């Protein structure tokens, strides 16, 4: 068990996954709150909304019509953050002197970023979230993620054979497949979901985004560097493999687990009820999951989202995302990657009080009040049937 003294004193915790520190202040949980309160998401949505750009059969903003899909539907984002076609930019690489132009080139660096962005609906039903779906209903979402990831792998990728095996097991999407980027080999695929208006979601229809980029983004890049460093310094051991063993032995931050996945409030969590879903065996990417593990992963996602909603009996907002091996990588980068999923929810004390990353957190380092151990205990107590099913 964690030293009990840490439950009562301010202290810092280290995040070995990205090399950062955060401040924990458990004594502040009793402070009064007179600040901003969020409007809880209590409105009942229709199963079909004729004005929704994502519902089956509807027209999207740029004029294309969605098919009358039954489960998932993926398409190229009409407002992509990165594009394949754009004017070429060649950054200067020879700034080695002390002249004004050299200094400016050193300090004002830029690099082109290209790619392709997709939108993926989780369900045809406008009023359904992952928390409302069964594990078997979530599996097609995971299968679509897998197909899109596999279609973007480089020709020399260490996981090409695994991708071929995986695709042979997964049925094709009856509503069609998205075409991968063709102009160049992309470096990384970031799958993420912003759920709820509090997290900036612009459409309540259940969906996620998939951005494929020519560069390795900052967060997965830092994690990959840390995992590679750990692997080199500890005779081939894996950082998250060892972390899973530590958390399973201690138990106090474990929220839920099955044979394939561990759900924890990590030691280094920044957000009040932050959760990390980690593969128990060395899975480097979606394409290495077996059919049984895809179901186990779906169960883990269902458990997290359902417990979130049960915690404050509201449609719990969060941002979530998957980190896995890059689309184009070396043997070492593939070997040191470990499949995991982050959940970052903002709610702190109730359905109306959220955490803000401001002030000290922006100027110094992240800070939290409730400890990860306390958060895990509360989430463990929120299992069972989704609260709103008893209200129907």
Curated annotation (Swiss-Prot):
EC number(s) per UniProt?
2.7.7.12
Superkingdom of origin: Eukaryota
**Repeat is among the record's keywords:** no
Q: Which GO terms describe its molecular function?
A: UDP-glucose:hexose-1-phosphate uridylyltransferase activity; zinc ion binding
An example GO CC term for this entry is: cytoplasm
Per the entry, the cofactor note is: Binds 1 zinc ion per subunit. Zinc binding seems to play a structural role.
InterPro entries, sorted: GalP_UDPtransf1, GalP_UDPtransf1_His-AS, GalP_Utransf_C, GalP_Utransf_N, HIT-like_sf
Question: Which CDD domains has this protein been placed in?
Answer: GalT
Pathway(s) the chain acts in: Carbohydrate metabolism; galactose metabolism
Task: Name the Pfam families for this protein.
Answer: GalP_UDP_tr_C (PF02744), GalP_UDP_transf (PF01087)
Q: Which UniProt keywords apply?
A: Carbohydrate metabolism, Galactose metabolism, Iron, Metal-binding, Nucleotidyltransferase, Transferase, Zinc
Instruction: Give me the residues that bind Fe cation, please.
Output: 223, 323, 340, 342
Record's catalysed reaction(s): alpha-D-galactose 1-phosphate + UDP-alpha-D-glucose = alpha-D-glucose 1-phosphate + UDP-alpha-D-galactose
Q: Which cofactor does it need?
A: Zn(2+)
Annotated residues that bind Zn(2+) are located at: 52, 55, 126, 205
Q: Which GO terms describe its biological process?
A: galactose catabolic process via UDP-galactose, Leloir pathway
- Residue positions of the active site: 207 (tele-ump-histidine intermediate)
Q: Which Gene3D superfamilies match?
A: HIT-like
Q: Which residues bind UDP-alpha-D-glucose?
A: 61, 77-78, 194, 209, 355-358, 360-361
Q: Which family does it belong to?
A: Belongs to the galactose-1-phosphate uridylyltransferase type 1 family.
Q: Quaternary structure per UniProt?
A: Homodimer.
Protein name as annotated: Galactose-1-phosphate uridylyltransferase
Please tell me the species this chain comes from: Neurospora crassa (strain ATCC 24698 / 74-OR23-1A / CBS 708.71 / DSM 1257 / FGSC 987)
Q: Which gene encodes it?
A: gal-7
